[in-house]
Amino acid sequence: EPKTQIPFDPELAKSLLEDAGYSDENPFPKLEILFNTNEDHRKIALAIQQMWQVNLGIEIELVNQDWKVYLNREMIGDFQISRAGWIGDYEDPNTFLDLMRPNRGNNKTGWENKEYDELVEKANTINNQSERYEMLYKAEEILIDNMPIIPLYTLSLIHI
């Protein structure tokens, strides 16, 4: 399995910021998080803002937009960080991996990786499940190494 979890290590993160030249005298630039008007999304944005400020000293401005404006800003790339979500709508790794392929409506990052795209594309033509999963596994490793998105949490719902 690819390493899919990044440990919570604020001291390592601070050290990496220092290595990159950031300090009290040269603070990390203020960032904006774009999110759409929804109470749950606001709570998540507030939690991120607080955690980054407390643990890393990074100042975050929250930018709350109505749904149409939010979608438009995402589509044209008018954001630094965007709070977004995805629900796996079918039981296959491709439900998430296909999101990051270039020229797809849900890839709002602008990230492209030719090898990643070729692996996902080729995997979609293979009938042997173990061979297909091996290709998707390699694609996932590329995605994790490049990290164009930061998965922060998984929503869990219980229905009775």
Question: What function would you assign to each model-found segment?
Answer:
Residues 27-29, 77, 145:
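Residue-level preference for short coil/turn positions at secondary-structure junctions
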